[in-house]
């Protein structure tokens, strides 16, 4: 990220553009981009065109920007995320192709869903998936790792529960979003807060717990409402029509459920508990899956050969290349925005928002998460803007940490976000199908929770302990 930013900063402005006009162009380009992707436009093409429009409208030299800043952003993103993505996606492919995901789904069905019927049965499936996302998030699974390993499980649960796919991405991401905001979890929002604010992962825990409780309450109310609504409309499992590759209906477990959870348990213990390198642990998990799931990964002939493994792993490699393109496009757009001459003015406005300083700080962290291209970078930007003046404004470091944990999650899940695209494409959905549920469980509920958290921090500073 630093390399991309530094190379961009060295690019001279081609011509002067009034600050107000440049900011209008940036905001308009972003809004049109979000709408286009929501309506089904290719996000790589849309982000590239938006970057060009921003260059023209803000005075950045378009040739230098598109030939230097944008490729450098792609390279930086690949350097940071490629191996992690590759291992996550291959592991998810192994779970789906072997039937291990089906085994985990059946285990969950026996333990949680039981013999319930009708709408109650469907509701239990959805609430169970929300809980799975929350538990795995608390366990240290970040969004991408959870998406690529748990979506196959979710698809099998959705088929068994006769639920439409449109609800799955929002349900899983709702649980993960709650975990990201929860004090004490080993996720980026908490870990990076230690670096930027010098606080503990449990900073301002009481407001944080209240905020997460509000998020989950909104999620549950929404799930109860939407499942009944879909049931009345007669909406059912629609994966077969969309070409989602699934084991045949009614197929018995090809992989023992206990064996199926071993790779996930391995990741939890080694990454979350022991703090080992994620890529190395994922690679070992892939080897474990290849060995433990061998009864499920079979070629057409009775004899097990390496060709089937090659097909599954090859499909994972192809999906990785596609996802890196989506992620790189979003990151490149963020780098273009950050390096416009109007960006410093835009961020400077945050400190001038009238009223309680916590309001301006919340807005800065929320918008920073989008413009900087990630929630972590958004938290870094908010701390850089408000850190030097926090004491004079009466803002404490623990409060900044906890508010930022909620705020950066709000606009980090807009339609052009890599995790949102990954979750949507993994379910073979269009953005307009999946995003209404995602917006409710990761944007609207988090916004409400953040407002409550900011109010608690401002009204009861004694609750904001580091």
PLM region descriptions:
Residues 2-26, 30, 206-312, 440, ...:
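Long, contiguous bundles of hydrophobic transmembrane helices that form the permeation core
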Residues 45, 69-103, 279, 287, ...:
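Core transmembrane alpha-helical segments of multi-pass membrane transporters/permeases
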Residues 89-90, 103-107, 144-157, 186-197, ...:
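Re-entrant/interfacial helical elements at transmembrane boundaries that shape
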Residues 19-23, 75-82, 109-129, 158-168, ...:
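Membrane-interfacial loop-to-helix junctions in multi-pass transporters
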Residues 22-34, 40-62, 81-89, 171, ...:
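Hydrophobic mid-bilayer segments of alpha-helices in multi-pass membrane transport proteins
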Residues 33-40, 92-93, 132-141, 173-181, ...:
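Transmembrane alpha-helix interface/packing and boundary motifs in multi-pass membrane proteins
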Residues 84-88, 114-155, 328, 353-393, ...:
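Hydrophobic alpha-helical transmembrane segments of multi-pass integral membrane proteins
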Residues 155-254, 419-457, 463-466:
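Membrane-core helix-loop-helix motifs of multi-pass transport proteins
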């Amino acid at each position: 990220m630093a390399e991309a930013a530094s190379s961009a900063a060295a690019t001279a402005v081609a011509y002067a553009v009034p600050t107000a006009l440049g900011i209008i162009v940036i905001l308009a380009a972003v809004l049109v981009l979000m709408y286009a992707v929501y309506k089904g436009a290719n996000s790589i093409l849309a982000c590239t065109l938006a970057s060009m429009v921003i260059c023209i409208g803000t005075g950045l030299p378009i040739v230098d920007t598109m030939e230097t800043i944008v490729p450098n952003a792609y390279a930086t993103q690949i350097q940071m995320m490629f191996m992690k993505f590759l291992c996550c996606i291959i592991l998810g492919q192994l779970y789906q192709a072997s039937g291990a995901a089906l085994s985990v789904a059946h285990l969950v069905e026996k333990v949680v869903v039981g013999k319930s019927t009708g709408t109650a049965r469907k509701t239990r499936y959805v609430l169970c998936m929300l809980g799975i996302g929350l538990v795995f998030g608390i366990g240290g699974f970040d969004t991408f790792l959870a998406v690529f390993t748990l979506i196959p499980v979710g698809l099998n649960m959705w088929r068994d529960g006769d639920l439409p796919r449109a609800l799955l991405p929002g349900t899983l991401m709702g649980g993960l979003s709650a975990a990201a905001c929860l004090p004490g979890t080993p996720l980026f929002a908490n870990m990076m807060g230690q670096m930027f604010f010098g606080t503990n992962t449990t900073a301002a825990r009481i407001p944080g717990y209240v905020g997460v409780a509000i998020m989950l309450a909104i999620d549950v109310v929404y799930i109860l409402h939407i499942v009944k609504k879909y049931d009345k409309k007669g909406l059912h499992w629609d994966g077969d029509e969309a070409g989602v590759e699934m084991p045949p209906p009614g197929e018995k477990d090809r992989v023992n459920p206990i064996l199926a959870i071993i790779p996930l348990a391995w990741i939890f213990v080694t990454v979350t508990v022991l703090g080992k390198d994620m890529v190395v642990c994922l690679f070992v998990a892939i080897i474990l899956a290849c060995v433990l799931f061998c009864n499920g990964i079979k070629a057409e002939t009775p004899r097990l050969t390496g060709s089937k493994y090659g097909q599954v792993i090859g499909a994972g490699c192809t999906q990785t290349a596609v996802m890196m393109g989506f992620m790189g496009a979003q990151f490149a757009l963020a780098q273009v925005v950050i390096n416009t001459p109007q960006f410093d003015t835009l961020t400077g406005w945050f400190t001038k928002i009238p009223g309680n300083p916590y309001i301006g700080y919340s807005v800065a962290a929320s918008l920073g998460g989008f413009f900087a291209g990630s929630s972590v970078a958004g938290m870094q930007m908010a701390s850089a803007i408000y850190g030097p003046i926090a004491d004079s404004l009466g803002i404490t470091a623990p409060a900044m940490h906890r508010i930022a944990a909620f705020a950066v999650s709000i606009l980090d899940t807009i339609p052009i976000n890599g995790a949102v695209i990954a979750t949507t494409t993994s379910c073979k959905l269009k953005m307009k199908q999946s995003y209404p549920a995602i917006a409710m469980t990761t944007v609207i509920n988090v916004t409400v929770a953040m407002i409550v958290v900011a109010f608690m921090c401002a009204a009861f500073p004694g609750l904001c302990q580091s």
